[in-house]
Amino acid sequence: MAQVGDKLPNVNITVIDKEGQKSVAANEYFAGKKAVLFALPGAFTPTCSETHLPGFVVHYDDITGKGVDAVACLSVNDAFVMKAWQDTQNAEKIAMVADGGGALTKALDLVLDTADFGGTRSRRYSMILDDGVITHLNLEKGGDFEVSGADTILKQLG
């Protein structure tokens, strides 16, 4: 399982950000950046849409004001779903990471098995990355939403 000190692996993700949509290795996308990556079980789901993503949208300027170069949201959904969700959530400043086949989620060993809900999903978490290395990891238990929100990240950034 991912832990502080680990480097993001060389697995492909699709990123939708201000530069458009691109397929890129996770370690390459986050290289040379101080970044926040948060993950959630699914786009358009209640907690993810009502609380988790909106918190990062509201606090985006506060987070980037603390020296963060990128704020990214990961879900095991395809790029079309992530783009549609970005649009409906007014989250254009947030880089949406479509981990369609779950390659990054599996490589980090942060899989949430929701067979009855939608198959393999990501556990809910947030992390701070420095040049692709995890410096802080806030991992939720089960379906909880207690420690992975924007408020926690802001406290950790100081």
PLM regions and their residue ranges:
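Chalcogenol-based redox active-site neighborhoods
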Residues: 1-158
